[in-house]
Regions:
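Hydrophobic core segments of alpha-helical transmembrane domains in multi-pass membrane transport
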Residues: 7-19, 31-43, 81-86, 123, ...
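Alpha-helical transmembrane segments of multi-pass membrane proteins
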Residues: 112-124, 150-163, 189-207, 381-384, ...
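Hydrophobic transmembrane alpha-helices of multi-pass solute/ion transporters
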Residues: 1-86, 98-99, 103, 280-285, ...
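Re-entrant/interfacial helical elements at transmembrane boundaries that shape
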Residues: 134-144, 158, 171-182, 403, ...
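Juxtamembrane and boundary regions of transmembrane helices in multi-pass small-molecule transporters
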Residues: 24, 166-280, 474-526
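Structural signature of hydrophobic alpha-helical transmembrane segments
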Residues: 1-8, 73-77, 130-135, 192-208, ...
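Short helix-coil transition sites and intra-membrane helix breaks within transmembrane domains
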Residues: 75-77, 88-95, 125-135, 163-171, ...
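Hydrophobic alpha-helical transmembrane segments of multi-pass integral membrane proteins
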Residues: 110-141, 145, 379-392, 408-444
């Protein structure tokens, strides 16, 4: 009964968005209200509350869970979404987006390659460096600027922002996953490398299938060409990511793998792709190119310098100007670094780039204010969804859903292990949060199934437990595609207010395929 009650918020959200075609902000807010009521009146009687909170007031527990969710929504998720769209609006205002469009089309006039370059290559790079929605918001906005339809731009950006999310924000999700199951609470480099490699192996077919889907969504009439490009780009992507994961760990697969994909796409475009005979090449000087790309170049510099790839700066930023909010009852403290978050890096990069492009600081602040006002419904959506996820977590609903799946599947559990991770990401919108929620569950089930030794998985030897634990992040990357939070980001980026349900409906078949294939790979490896 607990599992059935716990799944009500997820089902309700689907029904409201898909069945009743209710706008995302209304669906999310109504689902939050229902979730709070379930937590207040059903969680305790059904024994869903975790032992550490069994003696706490359910009213206080639920209330503080909502507060935590709202804090997480604003700091940093909404700030990052706002700044990502602000950066694009600067390009539109300065008209430098026209130069970027011409430069992209000068690489090739093949729309499929352009889309793949943006959502798979550039999007993967953004995910690897920053995460938190930038890899959906920025590529989708650029695609709109290149003349692609909003629905198409939203869908391909969501499909593209998947495999890289496991190693997003310089590897935080997989590092967190390993730390959660490590006996000491801090995973060894060897464990992180092994788990990273396992996740990439489990995702390997999707490195080819997803580029093929993206290319086919762009051009349905050249399937053979699409397959050749997908094989070329996908095999290079997965090979580079595997080498990075196996030897270096979780920090570099998405970043270096995406750079390799960008190079592979450009090489194919220059060597093999046919160019239109009537295409007129337009050249730009270095200063013109620098001016056009200054927004994203400065963003890239700030993210790299402030991130984990630059430890001294990263350590300084993380230990200065940090606000802490104690959350009674929950027994936790919410911390936010004012100078270490990706939102600030986006703001600084975009603003300095805007000044380089000739806009005054006053004009830039007007653009920021206008962008903020236009995102008011997205604010409601994101705040409601993250608060909902927090309530489901502390009331025990998410654990009840996972436990129900374990009980039903038995020895076939590895087949559905990625689904657990996908549910976590669907509810929370975060691969990292999904790993925090379910890493220990996956390790516990591995122990129950007798997966306590070592084995060889598709030619790679390692821990059986780590193989099943890696399945969580494998599924979590697929759940990212249909997470209402990701849908809300795509909706805002493509100016598709009220179209959340349509985007979700379009993405579901690809997400289901993704999660099923991930499950098959995990099961075959056991």
């Amino acid at each position: 009964m607990a599992s059935i009650i716990s799944i009500v918020p997820i089902v309700l959200l689907f029904v409201l968005m898909l069945g009743f075609k209710m706008a995302g902000h209304k669906s999310a807010l109504l689902t939050l209200v229902v979730t709070v009521l379930l937590a207040l009146f059903a969680a305790s009687p059904l024994g869903m509350i975790a032992p550490e909170h069994a003696g706490d007031s359910i009213l206080a527990l639920t209330g503080w869970a909502v507060v935590e969710g709202l804090l997480k929504a604003v700091f940093p998720i909404l700030i990052i979404i706002l700044m990502a769209i602000y950066s694009y609006n600067i390009l539109v205002e300065s008209k430098q987006i026209e130069v970027i469009k011409k430069q992209f089309t000068s690489i090739t006039d093949d729309k499929g390659l352009l889309v793949l370059l943006l959502v798979w290559g550039f999007g993967g790079l953004l995910e690897g460096m920053a995460g938190f929605g930038t890899a959906v918001a920025i590529p989708a906005a650029i695609l709109i600027g290149l003349g692609f339809k909003p629905m198409f731009s939203a869908l391909v950006s969501l499909v593209g922002n998947t495999v890289a999310t496991g190693f997003g924000a310089v590897g935080v999700p997989v590092t967190t996953l390993c730390n959660e199951v490590a006996d000491s609470g801090s995973a060894s480099v060897a464990q992180i490398c092994e788990t990273s490699a396992f996740a990439i192996i489990q995702l390997s077919p999707l490195f080819i299938i997803l580029p093929f889907i993206i290319l086919t969504l762009t051009d349905r009439h050249n399937l053979v060409k699409n397959l050749i490009i997908a094989l070329w780009v996908g095999m290079i992507s997965v090979a580079v990511q595997f080498v990075c994961g196996y030897y270096l760990g979780s920090e570099t697969p998405a970043i270096i793998g995406s750079i390799a994909a960008i190079v592979a796409i450009i090489v194919y475009a220059k060597v093999f792709a046919r160019k239109s005979k009537v295409q007129k090449q337009e050249t730009f000087t270095f200063s013109e190119s620098f001016k056009a790309w200054s927004v994203y170049l400065f963003i890239l510099v700030f993210i790299l310098v402030s991130g984990a790839l630059c430890p001294p700066v990263n350590a300084f930023l993380k230990t200065h100007l940090v606000s802490a909010v104690h959350l009674p009852v929950l027994g936790s403290t919410f911390k936010f670094g004012w100078i270490s978050n990706a939102g600030l890096m986006l703001f600084l990069g975009a603003t300095i780039g805007g000044l380089v492009q000739g806009l005054s600081f006053k004009r830039l602040m007007v653009i920021l204010a206008r962008t903020t006002v236009n995102l008011r419904k997205t604010v409601v959506t994101i705040c409601s969804l993250i608060a909902l996820a927090s309530v489901m977590n502390y009331s025990g609903m998410i654990t009840s859903i996972a436990s129900g799946l374990v009980a039903v599947t038995g020895d076939f559990y590895p087949l559905v292990a990625p689904m657990i991770g996908a549910i976590g990401t669907f509810v929370t919108g975060s691969d990292t949060s999904s790993n925090i929620l379910f890493a220990k569950l996956q390790a516990h089930v591995a122990n129950q199934l007798g997966m306590t030794g070592t084995d060889t998985f598709f030619g790679v030897e390692g821990s059986q437990s780590n193989w099943l634990v890696a399945a969580n992040t494998t599924g979590a990357t697929g759940g990212k595609m249909i997470s209402p939070q990701s849908i809300a980001i795509a909706t805002a980026s493509c100016d598709m207010e009220g179209k959340d349900g349509e985007i979700l409906r379009s993405a579901i078949p690809y997400a289901v395929l993704y999660i099923v294939l991930g499950g098959i790979m995990v099961y075959l490896g056991c």
